[in-house]
Structures are given as structure tokens and as C-alpha cells.
Amino acid sequence: MMNKLLTSLFLSSVITLGGCGLTKENYYVKHVEFPQDATLEQKIDMAARLVPTPQQAAWQQMELTAFLHFGINTFTGREWGDGQEDPAIFNPTELDAEQWVRTLKDAGFKMVLLTAKHHDGFCLWPTATTKHSVASSPWKNGQGDVVKELRNACDKYDMKFGVYLSPWDRNAECYGDSPKYNEFFIRQLTELLTNYGEVHEVWFDGANGEGPNGKKQIYDWDAFYKTIQQLQPKAVMAIMGDDVRWVGNEKGLGRETEWSATVLTPGIYARSEENNKRLGVFSKAEDLGSRAMLEKATELFWYPSEVDVSIRPGWFYHAEEDSKVKSLKHLADIYFQSVGYNSVLLLNIPPDRRGLINEADVQRLNEFAAYREKIFTNNRVEKGRKDWEAVSGSETVYSLKPESEINVVMLQEDITKGQRVESFTVEALTEQGWQEVAKGTTVGYKRMVRFPAVKATQLRVKINECRLTAHISQVAAYYADPLEEENRTENWNNLPRASWKQVAASPLTIDLGKEVELSAFTYAPLKAEAKPTMAFRYKFYVSADGKNWKEVPANGEFSNIM
């Protein structure tokens, strides 16, 4: 299977671009392998010529996409279902997919991506593979199809459409019988990719827990991706794919230095674990493409970042979170640190039990859209779209519109000619003369930097360091109204970290130092590890002396942590 995986998923080609009076350049599409004896300079040259596929470039240009977590969990109040839920509880009273798409379209989103099946195995379409679906629910007397309704709404409002299909299925009896379940999963995937028009993104996550029989599954990624390539060849394959990678967190934070031309080998390749371990990189690593990394690498991938985060604390709708929708300031910060950090933002907006995007979310999305529109409809730079071929140390001066006050600058590279900028500085000409207002490392498709507002007449952009010649496609400057964080009262009174200590790791044992009253606890794994050891199911015990333990009714599982 490993050899098949490498053969069927190794997508790399060389193209030559040029025109009348232009020097032709060779480009490597999606992947480049370095010769064994390549010097660092040769690797830098080849890295500069790595470019996205047309699908990857089109995906990057969407900038803002929406996740719709909706399903049986919406009605149980859980984040991860166990597959034992009764389909009878799925009964949205006012489901309106057009309201979803219309709301998101008005807010500037370019694609919606639906959880057609989450880990609980409940399917939002009337699949022929299982009875654990909408066909067994009272919604529309078992005749409903959420996927179809969303597809039709996307067609009506000219919105791109994507699907999330969980490989982990806690309901399927065949899960853990690897060949049988893989065939089962491919039938589900085939239904989604043949019955619902064009699919622009297929999203698989890496969760792989036990099924109802207590067994784990070995996924046939090779067969899954062949199915996608045959049925939806224009779709990008995200996360457990080689078109789009996970940024490494669910907080909405990209990297300040975000390389799309990365040394990280996608996990679907059999060699990925060995390659990434040798380089010391993983999805959360900060450095994925520096010269130091190139020196150690044997190959490079065009593998851009997708930043996924929920507008609420949870991924599925919970009524108690209606007052906890992220503030406008929080969303703005996320936007600048995702889209503004050379990534695509995938913002989750979960429909409620009625089957509507909740009023609290709609209001915030409208505020978010109005805020962005006010900023980005008034570019202060004159002639900022003039192409600029920049080498290390070169600079260009741009005139600003009269009486311009700015606090945001934006740079863009033409990524169809590679990602090349490694360091830049921006200065503004004020009444006091030239002053530095912004600096950064990578640019890529889009880089935005915020700074204290200044009044200026000109901008001077300097490319301090780049690979070969950087193709700057736009320089822009804007003014963003300052936002203040909302004051919220949380009913948490966490014990100071200095007041307790860990005395054992397995089972995890904490000495609180004194007798305290507890009402809740939180848990998070270490962030610095590539594959940290994590608790999934738990029981909770308390003791007055560390010897005699009493179980309290707090057993469960940490959903959405793996």
C-alpha cells in the first residue's frame, strides 16, 4: 500500500512561463525534490520556483470560508457523539439552508463547508450505507436531505460548496474491520461526490478513535484520494490531504512567518513521519520553510495554511453559548492573524436546533462584514496595484491620497510565480520625516501589518531579503477603527497554578496543598509536542489524604481534543 500511496499521490510537474520580452522561468507545481548534492543556494532557487496548482491558487483567493457544524450533536448538547444516539432526536423545526447561505454571502464568505457526517456517524443525507441518517429521523418524515438543501442554496446564491466527512465513525459496526469499513466509507464519499454537483473542498480530519467494537481503523487514504480525484478532480483536499494543511491550532492564529512553500511532508505520504521527524517539524511547528530548514530538507511542498476556529466556544450549537459569541474585536484580530498571515480563514458558524444561524451569530457576522468593508473599500495608496519585481535590498515609494491617516499596510505576492519575500520594511513619510511603521518576514498571497495610526503622504516599501526576484502584485494602506474588547463576567475562579502541583502522571494526580471546594476542572494537553500523550476518557476522584479516594460523578470524555 505504501508504494501505491506514493505513486498515486505524487503530483508534481514543471511548467515554463514567459512572454514577449520576458525571460522564461521554470516552475515546479506543488512539489519539488532536491538533488542529493544540491547546495543551499540551489535549494533556495528551486524553492522560489515552487508554485500552487490552479485549484490551490483559487482556494487561497477565497480568503474567508465558513464551517457549518450541524448534526445529531446539535440536539444532544455534545461536541463528540458516541454513535448511540437515536436519530429520532434530529428534528430541526425551521431548517433554512438559504438563510445560512444568504447570511454568509452577505458577510463576505466565499464557500460553505458542511459536516455531512461527524464522528457519531449520523449522516445528513439519506445514504444507502446506514440507517443512522436523516432518513430515520422525524424531520420531514424521513424525506429530508440537508446536503441537498445546502447545495441548492449555494447554487441560488453563487456560493462555493464543500463537505466534511469524518473517517472516524463511532456508529458503523464495520469500523475497525479495515477493508470492510474502507469500502463502506468510499461508498459514502462517492454518494457525496456524485449526487450534489461540484464540490470545491473535501475536508478530512485526523481523528482515529475506537469504533463501537472497540477496534481502531487503518484508513486506506490512497483509495479515498483516488475516489476524490476521479469524481471531483477540481476539489482541494484539506487537512488529511496534500492541498491544504491545518495551521496547527483552533484559536484562529496563523504564524507571522507563514510559508506556503513548506518542508512539512503531508501526512498522507508514507514517508511523512520519517521525513518530519528527521527535520523536527509537525503541524504546530513555528518554522516550516526557512533557509535553515531548506538546508536540511530533501523536498518541498506547496502546502498552504487553513486557519479553523469557531465563532463560539464550541463547534456545535449550544444555547448556553449565545452570550459567548466572539466579540467584533476578537474576530478582527483573528482575521488579521489568518488572512493577513498568508492563510485562509475557515470560521465555524453552527446552526441552532431550529436549523437557523442564530440571531446572535447573524448580528456579529453583520458587524464583522461592515467593519471589513469600511476598512478595505478605501485604499489610501495610489497606483498600488502596479507590478513590482523586487530583489533583495530594493525599494519603491508609493504616493498616498491627500490627508491620509493609516494604521494597516498590506503586501501581496503573485503566488503563481512563487513565494519569495523573506523580510520587508515599510516606512511612512510624516511631518517628522520618514519613520518605520511596519516590518515583517513572509508575504505570500497576502500579508497585513497593523501599527499605531500615522498621517502620511508617502509609503516606502523595502524588500530586505527575498529568494530570486519577488513578484509584488499589490501594496495597499488602510485605516481600521480601533476596537475595544467587551467586558464579560465569567463564573470561573481558577486556583493559581502556584498553589498546586502534579505528583503523578498516570493516573494524573494533583496535590492541591490544602482543602478546597471544587465545582469544575479544565484539562489541556501539552502544546509543544508533535504527538502529545492525551487523556480521552476520564473518571474523577478526590481524597483528603492522598490514600483513600472517592469517585465523584464527573466521568466522561474530552471531546474534540485529539
Task: Give the label of every model feature segment.
Residues L429-E436, S543-E551:
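Asp-box/BNR beta-propeller loop motif
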Residues T298, L483-Q502:
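Predominantly extracellular/luminal regions of secreted and cell-surface proteins
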Residues G393-S399, A505-G513:
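Non-catalytic, beta-strand-enriched accessory regions in extracellular/secretory proteins
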Residues A438-T442, V552-E557:
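Short beta-strand segments within Ig-like beta-sandwich modules, predominantly Fibronectin type-III
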Residues R447-T457, M562:
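Short, surface-exposed tryptophan/glycine-enriched loops
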Residues M1-N26:
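Bacterial Sec-dependent N-terminal signal peptides
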Residues T23-F451, K462-P482, E486, T522:
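Mature catalytic domains of secreted/periplasmic carbohydrate-active enzymes
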Residues K417-T425, A530-K539:
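Short coil-to-beta strand junction motifs in C2/discoidin
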